[in-house]
Amino acid sequence: MVHATSPLLLLLLLSLALVAPGLSARKCSLTGKWDNDLGSIMTIGAVNDNGEFNGTYITAVADNPGNITRSPLLGIQHKRACQPTFGFTVHWNFSESTSVFVGQCFVDKSGKEVLKTKWLQRLAVDDISDDWKATRVGNNDFTRQRTVEE
């Protein structure tokens, strides 16, 4: 029988107190390949010491789907948080429009990384009277693409 003040019990409790926070605070990383709920594919390169990153985006949805090409993205994230907030801009190569995304990188209870985002897309219009219809708003959830080894 183990007495309540046993050194073994104290050692066990101390070990659990030190290890448990690390188990629940898995860091979410933006770097890698992601796909969203619509089938778009995004690749984010390494995040530098300032939190800056670049990458590419291939949308699965467009007004002219036959013209879709890989488009560059440029962004920044907060580096200190385990589940960082971020923002990036996509310069669409196949249309006169630009999109900005803001979001947060989460690790869910099962350990899966998820990017929850909101976006604005600005379309080019020929006249200021059409400004009212030039900005679209939406949201996308991205999940990390599995690699062959997984």
UniProtKB/Swiss-Prot annotation:
GO cellular component: extracellular region
Position of the signal peptide: 1-24
InterPro entries cross-referenced by the UniProt entry: Avidin, Avidin-like_CS, Avidin-like_sf, Avidin/str, Avidin/Streptavidin-rel
Complex formation: Homotetramer.
Entry protein name: Avidin-related protein 1
PTM (free text): Glycosylated.
Example GO molecular function: biotin binding
Magnesium recorded as keyword: no
Pfam family, one: Avidin
Annotated positions binding biotin: 36, 40, 57, 59, 63, 95, 99, 140
Superkingdom of origin organism: Eukaryota
Compartment(s): Secreted
S-S bridge residues: 28-105
Glycosylation sites: 54, 67, 93
Domain Avidin-like residues, every copy: 26-147
Main localization category: secreted
Chain's role: Forms a strong non-covalent specific complex with biotin.
Family note: Belongs to the avidin/streptavidin family.
Keywords tagged on the record: Biotin, Disulfide bond, Glycoprotein, Secreted, Signal
